[in-house]
From Swiss-Prot:
Function: Involved in the biogenesis of the 60S ribosomal subunit. Has a role in regulating longevity, growth and brood size. May regulate fat storage via the insulin/IGF pathway.
Organism per entry: Caenorhabditis elegans
Cross-referenced Gene3D superfamilies: 1.20.120.1190, P-loop containing nucleotide triphosphate hydrolases
Disulfide bonds: none
GO cellular component, one term: nucleolus
Lineage, opening ranks: Eukaryota, Metazoa, Ecdysozoa, Nematoda, Chromadorea
Pfam families from the UniProt entry: NOG1, NOG1_N, NOGCT
InterPro entries, sorted: G_OBG (IPR031167), GTP-bd (IPR006073), NOG1 (IPR024926), NOG1_N (IPR041623), NOG1_Rossman_fold_dom (IPR010674), NOG_C (IPR012973), P-loop_NTPase (IPR027417), Small_GTP-bd (IPR005225)
Keywords, sorted A to Z: GTP-binding, Nucleotide-binding, Nucleus, Ribosome biogenesis
Principal location: nucleus
Annotated GO MF terms: GTP binding; GTPase activity; RNA binding
Designated name of the protein: Nucleolar GTP-binding protein 1
Tissues in which the protein is found: Ubiquitously expressed.
Residue ranges annotated for the OBG-type G domain, each copy included: 170-341
Length: 681
């Protein structure tokens, strides 16, 4: 159903036999099952009393769920209340729920009685018999309510199949004789698929379709056909339509068969319209002349056309439609929706929001004012005491007004020149506000009043009302304290003059050329020196990078390869590097050096003893390279050990260990123990 009434959520109602089996089985499963006569009598009594209480609580919960989930006739919308009365019989429905409630109270009483009797049982056998009697009596009550359980289950099934009707939303209701085209109309304007047959009473229940008009959601209700007979003679099918017309605030579409193929004449259809017309009160009503594809309104005899014209004179629109050719269908739908929208908007405008009962009563009270009979003034007599109270009340209201409204206060209080105001008026100023008439002599004047009197001459003084031992200290300068220090102790009173002296000295130094550079960088010699210095710096950077790369490579491959590496120093490299640095080397000297370098050594090498070669330099472990010193590494090791405590406590191998151990060993949870004498109980 809607958000208010969702009858589909009602739990299934078991029959008496099923409920008995369920509760007894649950009692046997959820309570202990082994007791021995060797136990103390208190333990035996508690064993059987627990079973009685458990069954009582289980039945209490089941019956309470049934009672609370079914809707109460007095609490739901009148439309659903009357519809349930028509479909299920209000008295039968209430009696069934009442029997459930009575059974619940009787079961509670039986349980209390037998738990009390259990205290006087002196053996296991007597306790068992009391438990058996208690369970038997409680289950016997369920068997006696067999018909009520079956009836409530049928009601639940039918309620869950009812259409989703929202009594508060925008609604169109189709009504009329059977077989006049109501179901065909709802199939055309909505996506509903109502069965359409050429015989009467094809529709035996309410059907709902939904449409969108002007970006709003509308529901269209197809009602069963209504026959022209007294209300007490109508059957259940017809009363569903009457209930919808009586309780739903909707636009009514009375469908008529102008071709008279529904075995009803125009006069009979209009007579039905007049008989159910009281149900259309305060609702927009439209008449749809259906089946105009067979017979138009203009083809009607004069006496029948006159009857329709009489309805139009009464303000009831009549629109010709044909559900076969779609003629006039959308026009009738739009006209009905527009009239209902206009009525809802007008009702919202005229409605007044009433918050409490007093406003509700005062809204209906008419106050009469007597007309004057002559020109004589008959003023009311006000006692002096009452006048003083009124003045005091005005003063309080004025003070509250000043606190809330601020500048608007001057426009809402009486204007009268005070002492200062009179002086200003004498000097040609404007009249100011005085509240002297609204207060007594002992009341202190507010700053707001003084401000209104003095206007632009007012200066706010918050220190004049300070209550100090020495009144002369009111206007002393309060020291500014920051973190326990007086800021005045850190301020040099002559700092401004000292700053001016420093600025003056700087100006004199600038004028004397103290900050001018002695190096003239415009001559050619200076430019050459700067260029050479730049080249030297770049060369140093390259050598530094080259050395770092070679050192890193040597550290990886070890000293064995380093010892057999080819000598990279040569005369050409030396000459190029010295030339780049601007050193002039004689060509002859370079040739002599080259010759000496290339001269091979003659003779055998002298065999001399040598010490053990250095081992290859092994790189440090990666987990140690990340730390700058040993202290940092020790701190990280401590944190790692602390983080692993939880894993060790849970016996996990590491952070990725997600193994779930067997929490239910089969030998402990199988049906029987291995010796064949005892079961799992």
């Amino acid at each position: 159903m809607t958000s208010m009434y969702n009858f589909k959520r009602i739990t299934c109602v078991p029959n008496a036999q099923e409920l008995k089996d369920v509760v007894l089985s649950k009692t046997q499963r959820k309570t202990p099952t082994v007791v021995h006569r060797q136990y103390s009598i208190g333990r035996i009594r508690a064993f059987y009393a627990r079973k009685i209480k458990f069954l009582q609580q289980t039945l209490h919960d089941k019956l309470t769920q049934i009672i609370t989930e079914f809707p109460k006739m007095e609490e739901i919308h009148p439309f659903y209340s009357d519809l349930m009365n028509i479909l299920y019989d209000r008295d039968h429905y209430k009696i069934a729920l009442g029997q459930m409630n009575t059974a619940r109270h009787l079961i509670d009483g039986i349980a209390r009685e037998y738990v009390r009797l259990m205290k006087y049982a002196d053996s296991l056998y007597r306790c068992k018999m009391l438990k058996r009697a208690a369970l038997g009596r409680m289950v016997k009550l369920l068997k006696r309510q067999k018909s009520s359980f079956e009836y409530l289950e049928q009601v639940r099934q039918h309620l869950s199949r009812l259409p989703s009707i929202d009594p508060a939303t925008r609604t169109l209701i189709l009504c009329g004789f059977p077989n006049v085209g109501k179901s065909s109309f709802i199939n055309n304007v909505t996506r509903a698929d109502v069965e359409v047959q050429p015989y009467a009473f094809t529709t035996k229940a309410l059907y709902v379709g939904h449409l969108d008009y002007r970006f709003l959601r509308w529901q269209v209700i197809d009602t069963p056909g209504i026959l022209d007979q007294p209300l007490e003679d109508r059957n259940t099918i017809e009363m569903q339509a009457v209930t919808a017309l009586a309780h739903l605030k909707a636009s009514v579409l009375f469908m008529m068969d102008v071709s008279e193929q529904c075995d009803r004449s125009i006069e009979e259809q209009l007579h039905l319209f007049e008989s159910i017309r009281p149900l259309f009160a305060n609702k927009p009503v439209l008449i749809g002349l259906n089946k105009v594809d067979i017979r138009h309104r203009s083809d009607l005899p004069p006496e029948k056309a006159a009857l329709l014209d009489q309805l139009e004179k009464e303000g009831i629109p009549i629109i010709e439609t044909s559900t076969l050719t779609q003629e006039g269908v959308m026009g009738l739908r739009d006209r009905a929706c527009d009239e209902l929208l206009a009525q809802r908007v007008e009702a919202k405008i005229q409605a007044k929001k009433i918050t409490n009962v007093e406003d509700c009563v005062l809204n209906r009270v008419f106050v009469a004012y007597p007309a004057p009979r002559d020109e004589k003034v008959r003023a009311p007599f006000v006692p002096p005491g009452l006048a003083a109270k009124r003045a005091q009340k005005k003063l309080q209201e004025a003070q509250e007004l000043m606190e809330t409204d601020g500048d608007e206060f001057a426009a809402k209080i009486p204007q009268k020149p005070g002492k200062i105001g009179k002086e200003k008026i004498a000097k040609g100023g404007s009249q100011s506000t005085d509240l002297g008439d609204l207060r007594d002599e002992n009341t202190r004047r507010l700053e707001r009043e003084i401000e209104l009197e003095m206007q632009d001459d007012y200066i706010l003084d918050l220190k004049k009302h300070y209550m100090l031992k020495n009144p002369d200290e009111k206007y002393d300068i309060v020291p500014e304290i920051w973190e326990g220090h007086n800021l005045a102790d850190f301020v040099d009173p002559e700092i401004q003059s000292k700053l001016e002296n420093l600025l003056r000295e700087e100006e004199l130094l600038e004028q004397a050329g103290e900050y001018e550079s002695d190096l003239d960088s415009d001559d050619e010699e200076t430019k050459e020196k700067l260029k050479l210095a730049l080249q030297i710096r770049e060369k140093e950077k390259l050598l530094t990078l080259d050395h770092a790369v070679n050192k890193r490579i040597a550290g990886r491959i070890g000293s064995r390869i380093h010892g057999s590496r080819k000598r990279d120093r040569s005369m050409s490299r030396l000459e190029n590097e010295l030339g780049e640095l601007g050193v002039d080397v004689d060509t002859k000297k370079m040739k002599n050096l080259q010759g000496q370098c290339a001269k091979p050594q003659l003779g055998k090498k002298m065999k001399v003893g040598r010490s053990r070669s250095l081992s290859a330099v092994r790189p440090a472990p990666r987990d140690e390279l990340a730390f700058p010193d040993e202290e940092k590494r020790a701190h990280v090791d401590k944190l790692r050990t602390k983080a692993m405590r939880g894993l060790r406590r849970e016996a996990k191998k590491g952070e990725a260990d997600r193994h779930v151990y067997d929490l239910k060993p089969k030998h402990l949870f199988c049906g029987k123990r291995g010796n064949g004498k005892t079961d799992w109980r």
